[in-house]
């Protein structure tokens, strides 16, 4: 595969409970915000795992991940100097519209692709809403890029409640919304943006086996004029216009 390469781990640190930030050397193609990589997590797992590009600069790539199974557990144990086998970047990424009033919305580890987006978007005004259950992470990296609002479901940090409540309040002040997070959050973004007639792009998170559209394991249902069809999250996405997706 023409995107296959090896990369040396530069750092791998835990930034919250079971959430890690890994940086590694990158001499491959420059990613577009919203694209992802397929990484060999080694161990007994034989399928690569998808990880959004969290940040990129000066031949260094950063990913954000949560330990959820054997693959990510293996990844969390890697040290500086270890070698990763990677393919990518894959997918379409976000369509960046210049000169707009922008709202970026992230939920939990779904904030992963949004930092790089926030750095690259050329907005007239940039608002950033980050939602967490209780423990927050990476908020400081978003500060200074735009006007940041943080919510936690328990109210331990920032505003108490769901991040979608911020979207409901601000939807009339923006031209486009970009979001990534749990499906209930993305469905709420879809409903809020469509009701307000505001553009919205969402990045879907799905389990993937190949990352190139061959296995059809990440298919999602999308609207068609006469019903619905299926698109591949890895090849046709992972970013879709919100009104396309059928949850």
UniProtKB/Swiss-Prot annotation:
Keyword field contains Endoplasmic reticulum: no
Cofactor section: [2Fe-2S] cluster; FAD
Chain ranges of the FAD-binding FR-type domain: 2-96
A molecular function (GO) term: oxidoreductase activity
Transmembrane stretches, start-end: none
Pathway field: Pyrimidine metabolism; UMP biosynthesis via de novo pathway; orotate from (S)-dihydroorotate (NAD(+) route): step 1/1
HAMAP family: DHODB_Fe_S_bind (MF_01211)
Family: Belongs to the PyrK family.
Subunit composition and interactions: Heterotetramer of 2 PyrK and 2 PyrD type B subunits.
Family annotation (PANTHER family): DIHYDROOROTATE DEHYDROGENASE B (NAD(+)), ELECTRON TRANSFER SUBUNIT, DIHYDROOROTATE DEHYDROGENASE B (NAD(+)), ELECTRON TRANSFER SUBUNIT-RELATED
Annotated NCBIfam families: PRK00054.1-3
Name of this protein: Dihydroorotate dehydrogenase B (NAD(+)), electron transfer subunit
Organism: Caldanaerobacter subterraneus subsp. tengcongensis (strain DSM 15242 / JCM 11007 / NBRC 100824 / MB4) (Thermoanaerobacter tengcongensis)
